[in-house]
């Protein structure tokens, strides 16, 4: 009897944990949402305008230690690969006080656009993001190439972006016409 009760309790606990994980996991996203954001510098960022280039969108928070630890790596990635077409947009969560986001952007010297998602519109458009860091890498065609909840694998991400850039470069130099 005790074993049966224990098994039932464990199954109930497992169901509760699974439901909690499901609740906080973003819904599947296939393409860049057609939304506009405004950067903290006042620049309008229409995500559809980023087609044709690799785009990394990362949801972060000033209170998220993993997010803060990623910032120097994202800055390095941006400085290395933005001349070749990479775009990065950081979206601060709705619960982040704007003055803290602005302060962190300035103190960390973040060169890529950072936006405030004050009403959580971007979080909803990306599948109801609730956990940080959550990142999406979109290919030049606007499709999701990589979706990550938690810390990014920076080496793998860099290789993925380099492959996209190389593919674009090869497409631009080789139109697929037969040699004559």
Describe the function of each predicted region.
Residues 47-65, 74:
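Short active-site neighborhood of thiol/selenol oxidoreductases, capturing the structured segment around
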